[in-house]
């Protein structure tokens, strides 16, 4: 089983075979429109605009599991992101990333990369989650905007914590292009 074996639905409900992304560098992100990290959409779009011609694709999976910060329908989320942040990358149907209803793609991603690579803000971020009563099991997605970086061969090479900004992983992306 690998990244290209999955089929997901896009924001309009159309089936998308991830095998269509073979040979591309992928940044897979679980997102929300009403999160303190939502401004990362702007930086994601900048990365996409700068590197899509070289083979970068960003796959956006909205998720409402973290304090219900993505309450809109998938189609509405796509519209909000396009209007507010000018996003042009692929937005998929809303999914769950933890628990009994975890999307199979995310179960796979978490099994391959169970630990977040954090930055200087990550420890504080995890402590804030704990203070809010947000308990996570080992390997769980901690919050919105966790990012998985996949190379051109479909190998998941890194999992970045929500606090790691798109700008901070630009060099990692460039190295794979």
Swiss-Prot record:
Q: Which gene encodes it?
A: gpxA
A single Pfam family, by name? GSHPx
Mind listing the GO molecular function terms for this protein? peroxidase activity
- What S-S linkages are listed for this chain? none
List the InterPro entries: Glutathione_peroxidase (IPR000889), GPX_AS (IPR029759), GPX_CS (IPR029760), Thioredoxin-like_sf (IPR036249)
Where is the organism placed in the taxonomic lineage, from the top? Bacteria, Pseudomonadati, Pseudomonadota, Betaproteobacteria, Neisseriales
Q: Which family does the entry's similarity section mention?
A: Belongs to the glutathione peroxidase family.
Q: What does this protein do?
A: Important in the cellular metabolism or defense processes particular to this pathogen.
The organism sits in which domain of life? Bacteria
What is the recorded name of this protein?
Glutathione peroxidase homolog
